[in-house]
């Protein structure tokens, strides 16, 4: 029997880490889907980035991508854990499944998915509230960096400037970057934490030509200097 869990929360609250740990502790098949969420007045959602799936797939190679139609065979459906992630700024008004935004329910119909559990950071006690922030105003910039390669010195300088206000008041930044030696680095920063998180992923790109894998940056904050960042 499949388990379909829907999880939401504000940017940077810890959704992806919770999902990773949940998958690691599960012995059966695992499937993942990320939805884009919805912007509100003065609160702009980031585009539906591929960063989270690329990171999770690197850590769990057999993870199924549910954004691809017919990606689950009948055999895969046996005892599968499906987690659907989407960003949401506000705490749902109702508990459990009754609190799911109807727009999400309608969107899931095209994937033939119906959640039987719903958790939201800031509402449900089993989820950490350490980095669950109450955003009142937020802008978003997302850049596709596929085939871009960064030398480490330039990348470190850019990231330092970014999180220290050179391009506006950044509240949240997340990126997957390619290095010349084939390494794949996840950068993660949120204003509520001290310092950035860096993780070298398992995947190494061949050194012949530019890498085709996902490389993106998502920046959220206030008074962002779009032109300087681009």
Where on the chain are the PLM-derived regions?
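Serine/threonine-rich low-complexity intrinsically disordered regions
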Residues: 42, 52, 73, 98-101, ...
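Structural alpha-beta junctions
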Residues: 27-31, 50-58, 95-119, 165-169
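Phenylalanine-focused residue identity feature
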Residues: 23, 53-55, 86-90, 121, ...
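P-loop NTP-binding site
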Residues: 2-18, 31-33, 126-230
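Nucleotide-state-sensitive switch-loop elements of NTP-binding domains
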Residues: 2-92
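Long, charge-dense, solvent-exposed interaction surfaces that engage phosphate-rich ligands
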Residues: 76-77, 86-136
């Amino acid at each position: 029997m499949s388990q379909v869990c829907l999880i939401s929360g504000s940017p940077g609250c810890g959704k992806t880490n919770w999902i990773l740990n949940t998958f690691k502790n599960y012995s059966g098949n695992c499937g993942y889907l990320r939805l884009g969420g919805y912007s509100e007045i003065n609160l702009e959602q980031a585009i539906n980035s591929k960063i989270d799936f690329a990171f999770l797939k690197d850590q769990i190679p057999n993870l199924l991508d549910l954004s691809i139609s017919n990606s689950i065979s009948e055999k895969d459906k046996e005892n599968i854990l499906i987690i659907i992630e989407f960003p949401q700024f506000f705490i749902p008004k109702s508990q459990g499944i009754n609190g799911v935004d109807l727009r999400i329910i309608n969107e899931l119909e095209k994937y033939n998915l119906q959640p039987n559990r719903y958790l939201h950071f800031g509402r449900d006690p089993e989820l950490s509230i350490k980095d669950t922030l109450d955003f009142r105003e937020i802008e978003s910039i997302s850049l596709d960096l596929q085939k871009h390669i960064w030398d480490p010195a330039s990348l470190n300088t850019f990231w330092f400037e970014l999180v220290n206000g050179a391009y506006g008041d950044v509240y949240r930044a997340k990126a997957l970057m390619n290095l010349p030696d084939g390494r794949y680095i996840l950068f993660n920063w949120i204003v509520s934490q001290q310092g950035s998180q860096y993780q070298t992923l398992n995947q190494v790109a061949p050194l012949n030509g530019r890498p085709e894998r996902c490389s993106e940056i998502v920046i959220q904050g206030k008074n962002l200097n779009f032109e300087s960042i681009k």
